[in-house]
């Protein structure tokens, strides 16, 4: 039986390099299901929806993306089983453009909705970005310039001030 639902594009600041593309009869209930988990630091948010008249029509979108680039989908082997998920390594804008093209081909562009972020979502996005930036900074090799110590300046060993060196980076 056909029923109106939506193909959705979800984002999550916990993994900004991925989008989740799926189907839901009720997008609000789907968000509640996904965001109930304590396993992810930030909540999923709806980037866009595309109203459709048949369940599981998202599988057709998955098939198109997989045929164009099978490396975009999140697939892993875990405990001897292959886990194939609805996550794709693409920007939400790229995912949206795929749905937009399909909507235009079918003359249903009015059924495609891009959802604006509210203030709480913007704040969570900024927090996640700050955490990611901090993490990247901690992973990068140490440079004295990170401590505002410039080339040519001299530093000394704290346990023996007679041991000195000149900064060259």
Enumerate the language-model features and the residues they cover.
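Non-catalytic accessory segments flanking enzymatic or RNA/DNA-binding domains
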Residues: 1-149, 161
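Short beta-strand-centered aromatic/proline hotspots
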Residues: 163-169
